[in-house]
Amino acid sequence: MTSAVPATSLILWLAVALGGALGALARYSVSIAWMPAQLKFPVATLTVNVLGSFLMGVFYVVIVEKAMLAPVWRHVIMIGFLGAFTTFSTFSIESLHLWQSGHWQIAISYVVANVVLSISAVVVAIVLTEKLV
């Protein structure tokens, strides 16, 4: 006996998949854009994490708090797109590589920058968006 997946669930799965595919492509584009710089500091990952956190704050207000978009957009944008766009795993491995290669000062500043700037970005986005919408 097989159980059918409700149409609503299937739509949400597809919404996450669509958003995730677009977020992954956007993430890859940022990496490619920063590649020629050949910096020791992982600017591309920091950029997507801070920008993604800011956008998460904006869409949290628009979708969750104010319900200005249909709930399915939470799955497309917040779970799919921003989930794929931001990257904790890359941040983790880059931090480890910096530490292991003897660049512990850069590693520590990278970890602090990611955490402080990302949390600050989401807070600023929420405050600004609540005032503007």
From Swiss-Prot:
Q: Among the record's GO biological process terms, what is one? A: cellular detoxification of fluoride
GO function terms (MF aspect): fluoride channel activity; metal ion binding
Q: Which GO terms describe its cellular component?
A: plasma membrane
Work out whether the entry's keyword set contains Transcription regulation. Answer: no
* Keywords annotated in UniProt: Cell inner membrane, Cell membrane, Ion channel, Ion transport, Membrane, Metal-binding, Sodium, Transmembrane, Transmembrane helix, Transport
Binding residue positions for Na(+): 83, 86
Activity regulation (UniProt): Na(+) is not transported, but it plays an essential structural role and its presence is essential for fluoride channel function.
Which sequence ranges are marked TM in the entry? 5-25, 43-63, 76-96, 108-128
- Which membrane topology describes this protein? Multi-pass membrane protein
Where is the protein found, in the record's own terms?
Cell inner membrane
Predominant localisation class: membrane
Database matches in Pfam families: CRCB
Mind telling me which InterPro entries this protein's record contains?
Answer: FluC (IPR003691)
Q: Origin, by domain of life?
A: Bacteria
Q: Which reaction does it catalyse?
A: fluoride(in) = fluoride(out)
Fetch the HAMAP family from UniProt. Answer: FluC
| Family to which the UniProt record says this protein belongs | Belongs to the fluoride channel Fluc/FEX (TC 1.A.43) family.
Q: Entry's PANTHER family?
A: FLUORIDE EXPORT PROTEIN 1-RELATED (PTHR28259:SF1)
Q: What's the stated role of this polypeptide?
A: Fluoride-specific ion channel. Important for reducing fluoride concentration in the cell, thus reducing its toxicity.
| Name used for this protein in its record | Fluoride-specific ion channel FluC
Organism equals Saccharophagus degradans (strain 2-40 / ATCC 43961 / DSM 17024)
